[in-house]
Amino acid sequence: MKVLWVALVITLLAGCQAEVEPEPEPEVQLGQEWPGWQDSQPWEQALGRFWDYLRWVQTLSDQVQEELLSTQVIQELTVLMDETMKEVKAYREELEGQLAPIAQETQARVSKELQAAQARLASDMEDVRSRLAQYRSEVQAMMGQTTDELRGRLASHLRKLRKRLLRDAEDLQKRLAVYRAGALEGSERSVSAIRERLGPLVEQGRARAATVGTLASQTLRERAEAWHQKLRGRVEEMGTQARDHLEEMREQLEEVRAKVEEQGSQMRLQAEAFQARLKSWFEPLVEDMQRQWAGLVEKVQLAMATSSTSAPSENH
């Protein structure tokens, strides 16, 4: 199966470099919806939003004309471009990580082809943005004059650019689909290969154990013991590798936990320092207010006592 997968990838790569008669580009109608694909990926959905926005721009309606004279359309297209290429890059890197089981040279060629297809798609979207920016400059230079010819040229350019965008998007989608299928096949093949290698060993072990139990020959027992040691060595080796991997993961988790605890300690110390600072600020104020309040209460009490003693005197 591995040979078939490698042959498929090499054939696809070679076919992309062969000189063939160019197929006629599909006619892209103004109102044509983004084709989309079954079980579409996030990058395909983002590209669909770019396509729908471009379709709206291509109507060259009064609202489009007004926003083209500002920077709104170009800014919104830039946001959609960045979102699309970000999703494409993330999906491509995910597939490259899953292609680890294939040969290093083949993997490098696959990565190169995916990057080239991604670059073509980015170039198509950049051409759209550049053409709209150019149209905006030309319209502003011809303020007060008829712009029908410019609008016609822009509409023609946008139709051609949408054809290229559709063609290169479908090319990238087909490549990613092929490589994704190969990655899934490679993962399943790795599990099957391990099962195929260990299955015969287990069966042989059972057969040898049964044979040793029925034979009294010391030579056969020694051979069985040697085979047993060999099998145990292989199992221990695989177990050691698994433990090393788990230990590495544990160390990484410990590092993360230590960093989190360190940051938590720093935040706690900062909070305590801030609390102490606040306390040092407000304690003198509170004490001063308490003293003033006590003095005020004392004065009120003294005034009330003076008033009560002077009242009887006046009665006499």
From Swiss-Prot:
Keywords: Chylomicron, Endosome, Extracellular matrix, Glycoprotein, HDL, Heparin-binding, Lipid transport, Lipid-binding, Oxidation, Phosphoprotein, Repeat, Secreted, Signal, Transport, VLDL. Residues 209-289 are annotated as: Lipid-binding and lipoprotein association. Heparin binds at residues 161-164, 228-235. The keyword Phosphoprotein applies. GO terms for molecular function: cholesterol transfer activity; heparan sulfate proteoglycan binding; heparin binding; identical protein binding; low-density lipoprotein particle receptor binding; phosphatidylcholine-sterol O-acyltransferase activator activity; phospholipid binding. Residues 79-254 are annotated as: 8 X 22 AA approximate tandem repeats. Residues 265-316 are annotated as: Homooligomerization. It is found in: Secreted; Secreted, Extracellular space; Secreted, Extracellular space, Extracellular matrix; Extracellular vesicle. One of its GO terms (cellular component) is extracellular space. InterPro entries: ApoA_E, Apolipoprotein_A1/A4/E. GO terms for biological process: acylglycerol homeostasis; cholesterol efflux; cholesterol metabolic process; chylomicron remnant clearance; high-density lipoprotein particle assembly; intermediate-density lipoprotein particle clearance; lipoprotein biosynthetic process; melanosome organization. The modification Methionine sulfoxide is found at residue 142. SUPFAM superfamilies: Apolipoprotein A-I. Residues 1-18 form the signal peptide. Belongs to the apolipoprotein A1/A4/E family. Homotetramer. May interact with ABCA1; functionally associated with ABCA1 in the biogenesis of HDLs. May interact with APP/A4 amyloid-beta peptide; the interaction is extremely stable in vitro but its physiological significance is unclear. May interact with MAPT. May interact with MAP2. In the cerebrospinal fluid, interacts with secreted SORL1. Interacts with PMEL; this allows the loading of PMEL luminal fragment on ILVs to induce fibril nucleation. This is Apolipoprotein E. The lineage of its organism: Eukaryota, Metazoa, Chordata, Craniata, Vertebrata.
